């Protein structure tokens, strides 16, 4: 797998679980002999929802809910076959979405 690059994109609602997952990936890749660039924090996506509190009237009384999606990007340059096998067997915390591009 010479001159290849693996790009891993992580998404999660909680930044602490996202950082632990990124830490595990970086540690595994460096242990197997690959060069790692990252984790690079990407912009946080923020969704805001405004809902009327009352069922039928009182439109002035509203409640706002917010959902933040944190993202990280990790590039693994020149991965070995050992690196790919170790990443496939890696156990990441639940709640982290992983997208891998070769």
From Swiss-Prot:
Protein's GO biological process: translation
InterPro entries to which the protein is assigned, alphabetical: Ribosomal_uS10 (IPR001848), Ribosomal_uS10_CS (IPR018268), Ribosomal_uS10_dom (IPR027486), Ribosomal_uS10_dom_sf (IPR036838)
Keyword tRNA-binding: no
Keyword list, A-Z: Ribonucleoprotein, Ribosomal protein
Gene3D superfamilies the UniProt entry points to: Ribosomal protein S10 domain
Database matches in Pfam families: Ribosomal_S10
Subunit-level organization: Part of the 30S ribosomal subunit.
Function, as annotated: Involved in the binding of tRNA to the ribosomes.
Name of the protein in its database record: Small ribosomal subunit protein uS10
Source organism of the structure: Streptococcus uberis (strain ATCC BAA-854 / 0140J)
Lineage, broadest ranks: Bacteria, Bacillati, Bacillota, Bacilli, Lactobacillales
């Amino acid at each position: 797998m010479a001159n290849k690059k693996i790009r891993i994109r992580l998404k999660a609602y909680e930044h602490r679980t996202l950082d632990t997952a990124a830490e595990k990936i970086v540690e595994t890749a460096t242990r197997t002999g690959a060069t790692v660039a990252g984790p690079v924090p990407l912009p946080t996506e923020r969704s805001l929802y405004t809902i009327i509190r009352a069922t039928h009237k009182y439109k002035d009384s509203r409640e706002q809910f917010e959902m933040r999606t944190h993202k990280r990007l990790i590039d693994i340059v020149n991965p070995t076959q050992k690196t790919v096998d170790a990443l496939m067997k890696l156990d990441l915390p639940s709640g982290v979405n992983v997208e891998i591009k070769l």
